[in-house]
Amino acid sequence: MATLLATRGNRATWRDYLELTKPKVVVLMLITSLVGMFLASRAGVPWTVLLFGNLGIGLCAGAAAAVNHVVDRRIDALMARTRRRPLAEGRVAPLAALGFALALAVAGMALLLTFTNPLAAWLTLASLLGYAVLYTGFLKRATPQNIVIGGLAGAAPPLLGWVAVSGQLSAEPLLLVLIVFTWTPPHFWALAIHRKAEYAKAEIPMLPVTHGEAYTKLHILLYTLALLAVTLLPYAIHMSGPLYLLCALLLGGRFLHWAWALYKDSKPHAAIGTFKYSIRYLFLLFIALLVDHYLPLTL
């Protein structure tokens, strides 16, 4: 198999290498990073930090994604959702993908160290290692709580963006991390229910596989309730205003509607519907934070 992968890897195109970075996921991460940057300052963000800081974070995120492709290539080949990925089909060789990941990581770290600050750079590296090594290499195969524990690495981008501008940690960016951290389990568990048979075939201990769908649906509902509460905290600590509060309540209410429908089996395809809405939810919630920051309303 290794020989086959190496041989067929010669057929790789630039699109295959782009796919290794999981660009859709990285774009969503960069949106939260971008919002973190702008929330860190009302005076504006220096263009060098805005451009090269986000580029550095994006390159490191892409590096982590490429490592994920390498480690999961045999699992990916067993699942319909992932079997067309470059390494699963053998279009890119594992060593080539690892070299690509290393190049992205080095370039990303160089940009962060040059144009932002050491704290932002090292936190980004910690996030990269947390996802690529701790989650992908160990937690994903070890425990049904893989998403909960490993979600911290994926929740880091708004913190990274904030620190890239401010150069220091504070309560506000940690709250942004908490929002993404709490959002992660219902987001991924909804997909895991939809793809339960594939995860079981690949022997990945996702919660629906190990504990059943009813248990997972209950926990999706509970986490969604917790998420709704957590998203009210920016208003409670005067980090945001009434505009954000209204958006958080409306968006959270809709998320709760999907979670309840999934729990009660009252909608066809509720699992994938919940998953898709969760993506829109996070995007719109962070946009609401940003708009509220620059267009505050008073009651």
Swiss-Prot record:
Q: What is its EC number?
A: 2.5.1.141
Name the HAMAP family on file: CyoE_CtaB
Q: Does the keyword Transcription apply?
A: no
User: Which protein are we looking at?
Assistant: Protoheme IX farnesyltransferase
Q: Which UniProt keywords apply?
A: Cell inner membrane, Cell membrane, Heme biosynthesis, Membrane, Transferase, Transmembrane, Transmembrane helix
- A GO biological process this protein is involved in? heme O biosynthetic process
Role, per record: Converts heme B (protoheme IX) to heme O by substitution of the vinyl group on carbon 2 of heme B porphyrin ring with a hydroxyethyl farnesyl side group.
- Give the reaction(s) catalysed: heme b + (2E,6E)-farnesyl diphosphate + H2O = Fe(II)-heme o + diphosphate
One cellular component term from this protein's GO annotations in UniProt: plasma membrane
Coiled-coil intervals, chain numbering: none
One molecular function GO term is:
protoheme IX farnesyltransferase activity
Membrane-spanning regions, if any?
25-45, 47-67, 95-115, 119-139, 147-167, 173-193, 218-238, 243-263, 279-299
Misc: Carbon 2 of the heme B porphyrin ring is defined according to the Fischer nomenclature.
Q: Quote the PROSITE patterns the UniProt record gives.
A: UBIA
Question: Mainly resides where?
Answer: membrane
* Lipid bilayer topology: Multi-pass membrane protein
Q: Which pathway is this protein assigned to?
A: Porphyrin-containing compound metabolism; heme O biosynthesis; heme O from protoheme: step 1/1
> Would the keyword Translocase be found if you checked this record's keyword annotation?
no
**Cited Gene3D superfamilies:** UbiA prenyltransferase
